[in-house]
Structure formats: C-alpha cells, structure tokens
Amino acid sequence: MMKSEWNEEQIKELLSQLPAVKDHRSPQDIYKRLTMAKRKNKPAVRWIGPACAAAIAVYIAFIISPHFFDQAQPQQKEASQENAVTKTETEDSPKAASSLDQTSFVVPEKEQDNYITVAVADADTSAIIPVSIQKTNADQTIQDMLFESSELGILDHAITIPTFIDEVEIKEKPKQKELSIRVHQPATAFSIKDDTLLKKLLKESLKWSPYEKVKFLSDQNETGVRIGSYGTFTEISIPKQSKRSYYLYQNKQGQDFLVPSNHSFDTVKEAIKEMESSSQEDTTPLIQAGAVQSVTKKQKHLYIRFSKESEVDDSIAGILMIEGLLLTAKEFGFTEVTFTETRTKKIGKYDISDAIPVPAAPNPISLN
C-alpha cells in the first residue's frame, strides 16, 4: 500500500483555504434528514400545504393496506400495456382461469354494506382514486373506521387529508340518509391549489357514501362551519349520478385502479366513446378504438354491442373493460348492462350471456 506524501499540517493548511460553509439547520433537523435519506426506496409523501396540521376534520381519510397491494400486484401487472388494455393476452392455463374468476376491481351491489368508499390522491400525480375499504365487522361505523385507519400510518404513495379524531364527532342517520359532522376546530388558510385538491377528495368520497346529504355543526352545535377558503359550510347535497366515464390508472408501483373522468358527459354514448381514447393525463383507455359498435338503452337497462373485430376476451384487460363500462353505466343511472358480440360468454366471474347488474363502487381493498 502506497504511503501518502501529504502530512497532517499540509492537509490542515489546504482545508483552511476552503470557503466557509454554514449550516443553519438544528441538530434535530439534520438527524431527521439523514434518517429520511436512508429510505431511498420509499417515495416521500407530499402533503397538501402548510395548513394541513390543522386540516379539515370532516374528510374521512382511510389508509390503504400494503398487504393487499402485495397480493394484488401479480394480477395488476398483467394489465400493464403500452396502448389500450384490451390488447393484453389471455391466460389459458387452469391456474390462470381460476385466478380470473377471483379477480375484480369493483364491489358488487350485494356487498355494499361491507365497504366504505373514500378518495385518495396519488402523491406523484395528484390523481383522484376512489378506493372501497372493507369493514372489519358488519356493525362498524364511519367513526369506528376513522379510529382504526388512523393507527396504521400513511402510505407513501397516497395523499389523504389528516383527520384529528378528537376534533370531530360524526353521527350517522341511516333512516334520514344523513351524515352529521360536528367540527370542534374549524380549518382555515388553505391555498387555492390545496382547496382544489381538497374539494375533489371530499366530493369523490361523499359520492360513494350511503347518505344523500351531510350537515355541518360547530362546537357549540350551531349550524355551519367555516372550511378553508370555501366560506361557511352548512349542508351539502351528494349527487349520485355524475355522468362520467372510467379509465385505467396505474401508479408507479404497478397497481391498477379504475378512475372516473374529470368532466361529465351529456350522454352515456359520449362517455363510452371517450373511453376509447382518454384525453385525461396519466390514464389509459379501457376500450380499443372501434371496439363498441352500438350503445342503446331501454329504461334503466343499457345494451352494449361490440364489433366483430373487437378483442373482448377472458383476461385481466377484459375484466377491467367490462367493469369500467359497468361503472360508467352506473354514473348515468342504469341498473344493469347487457353485452353482445363478445368472443366468449365468460369474462372473469361474469356470465356475459346474461344481463349484469352495475356494481356498488370501484377498487375494493382490505385493511389488515
């Protein structure tokens, strides 16, 4: 090993000639940043502005279970693609067929009472994603779920609004289809950007609730609470038919979600046409161009006829397409959909030869 020609005094002299560097951070801050730097494999959570420490307590923020996503990732990677998801190859093995029978990206209507649907935003793109979280027991209330989910921490990939359990009291009135929220500490001082994201999260969450209106009460039990730059909230009606289409959204972890469009459409035919070529950023169309030949309706029954050239088969891509169309039909008030001219009579768990009821909500997950 070669010996250095520099002695200690020469090294000190050279170091003394370097420009002075001052670090105004506290020792605690430096330690915190060094600790965070070790977690390079975890993307940082992007919070929604400085006011989030006292953020709105009326938004019911639930946490997605990482265990669920570990289970779901293999089937979700099958849906990855460069263009339309309907180009994904069908798995023909018995094991794959059995897996397809269990694969679904929606909550069936008969299981609606077992889930609570809320919205989260992707930390990288701010895309709004509705997720349906399974209750841990049949009698669990929104308030119970609030306590349970708050103990799990925040996932790196998701943005939620911090909810302070001790600052909010939630009462459910199922018979009146009303949700009452008493806010003990009003939230203020949101930026315009934060207000927009908050509004989207709140609106999407309330849409999937079993309630038709939400009433806001102050700590003194008076009607109305001031929230951000919105002004005073007294009561919010919850529209159930937003007339939107659905697309495939895939985050950086390769997880797939069915997400609604940012804008609404005049007719269901227009909405389905838009699903062939999504103009929405960070989404992929669920339908191959020209795959749908006609869309007709009879009362609350929708009929979708595919073209003979369409690639509609029993695959992950086929399931995503069928369920995306079912959710789109639900947005326009339809209760069931009949599909014709498919390559197969079975796609996933669905018997395509029969009318299919629209689902209750998108993207079911489990908390563990």
Swiss-Prot record:
Residues 73-87 have a biased composition (Polar residues). Residues 73-101 are annotated as: Disordered. Keywords: Cell membrane, Membrane, Repressor, Transcription, Transcription regulation. Its main location: membrane. Signal peptide: none annotated. It comes from the Bacteria. One of its GO terms (cellular component) is plasma membrane. Disulfide bonds: none annotated. It is found in: Cell membrane. It is a peripheral membrane protein. Disruption phenotype: Insertion mutations in this gene partially restore antibiotic resistance to the beta-lactam antibiotic cefuroxime (CEF) in a sigM deletion mutant. The anti-sigma factor for extracytoplasmic function (ECF) sigma factor SigX, inhibits SigX activity and stabilizes it. This is Anti-sigma-X factor RsiX.
